[in-house]
Each structure stands twice: as structure tokens, then as C-alpha cells.
């Protein structure tokens, strides 16, 4: 008859308990590691998604009160407006605030720090406008403020449209934008002909009478 001493039985019981405890700890550690790994993956995924949403839109958190911001990408033949604020059709606006159709707007290109610009980037056929504010047809405007055809205005003009932008006079005087700069060759019929600015391109819905009435929109042309 086989007999076991109390010490052997106790030792076996302790050994079994240690094995059970070790298995439980291993399972616990595995579960904990799995949960941590899932949490880490979740954090990585969140970071990746955040970065993905941050891509293309550079400093999108600076874009305030964007009107129709969903229209802000690849708008109409426009490119590279930097820091364009309150821009109406301002192009590829970087830090664009209160932008109406603010990205890749209307033939706008290379506008840097353009504020309150209507077609401010290369403001409606304006080339290399730097800090051009409210510049419409402003060409090579450097720090031009509220210039809407401003280089043709004078403070004594009683036309309401020009008086509205009269403060541009100091910035765009005749000596700065003389006839040689905006002569017939620069703004001739071929440049602003019917095919380029036809009814479909600038119809009533896009540029209504109140905004660009017929008598004041291309007065200098």
C-alpha cells in the first residue's frame, strides 16, 4: 500500500497553487497587454486621422467665419493665396477668415496676405498682389488697401462706387499705375472680351447689379 506523508501532500498542493497562480497571472498579463496594445493602436489611429484631416488644410484652425467653406477647394482657376482674410473668391487662402468661396478662387494666384480681397489673389487678373486688401484688378499691388480699381480713382470723384474705395487713392496714384502700366495692350478687348467675361461667367446670380453694376464695374475700360 502506497502512503504519502503530510509534507509531500502539502508540497504538492503548494506547487499546484503556484502553477494555477502563475497561469492566472500570465492570462491577466496577456489580457492587459492586449488591451494596452489596442489602446495604443486606437491612439495611433486617432493621431493618424487627425494628421490626415490636418493635411492640405494648413492652419485650418485659423479659418474663422468661413462662408461656404465647403466650396473652398479648387474653386475657379485660382491658386496660392496666402493669409487672405475676408476674401471673396480669394484663392487657396491660407489663414483665410470670412472667406466666401475662399480657395482656388477666380483666376486668383499668388496673393500674399490679401485681406478683404474681392478676387484678391491675382485680384481678377491682378498679378503678384502682395498684401493687397480689397484689391479688384490690382496688378503687382504691394500693401494695397481697399483698392477696387483704385489706381484709377481720385478723391474728388463723386461716383459712389469710387468714393467707397477712395482711400486707395494714396496707394494707387497715377504715378504708380500710369497709362503705360494699364494701357490698351494690358486691358484691351482681347483681355476682357465677351468670351472671357460672358453672361454665363459673370451672370446675375454670381455678380448681381448691387455688387457689380454695369456702369461702375469696368468704368476705366
Swiss-Prot record:
- Signal peptide residue numbers: 1-21
- InterPro entries registered for this protein in UniProt: Plasmodium_HRP
Q: Does the keyword Repeat apply?
A: yes
For the region Disordered, give the residue spans.
52-141, 180-221
**Region described as 13 X 6 AA approximate tandem repeats of A-H-H-A-A-N:** 69-146
Output compositional bias ranges, type Basic and acidic residues: 52-67, 180-211
Q: Which UniProt keywords apply?
A: Malaria, Repeat, Signal
Instruction: Point to the regions of Low complexity compositional bias.
Output: 75-141
Q: Can the keyword Signal be found in this entry's annotation?
A: yes
Which parts of this chain are annotated as the region 4 X 3 AA approximate tandem repeats of A-H-H?
57-68
7 X 5 AA tandem repeats of H-H-D-[DG]-A, as annotated region: 176-210
Question: In residue terms, where are the sequence repeats?
Answer: 57-59, 60-62, 63-65, 66-68, 69-74, 75-80, 81-86, 87-92, 93-98, 99-104, 105-110, 111-116, 117-122, 123-128, 129-134, 135-140, 141-146, 176-180, 181-185, 186-190, 191-195, 196-200, 201-205, 206-210
Protein's name according to its UniProt entry: Small histidine-alanine-rich protein
Q: Provide the species name.
A: Plasmodium falciparum (isolate FC27 / Papua New Guinea)
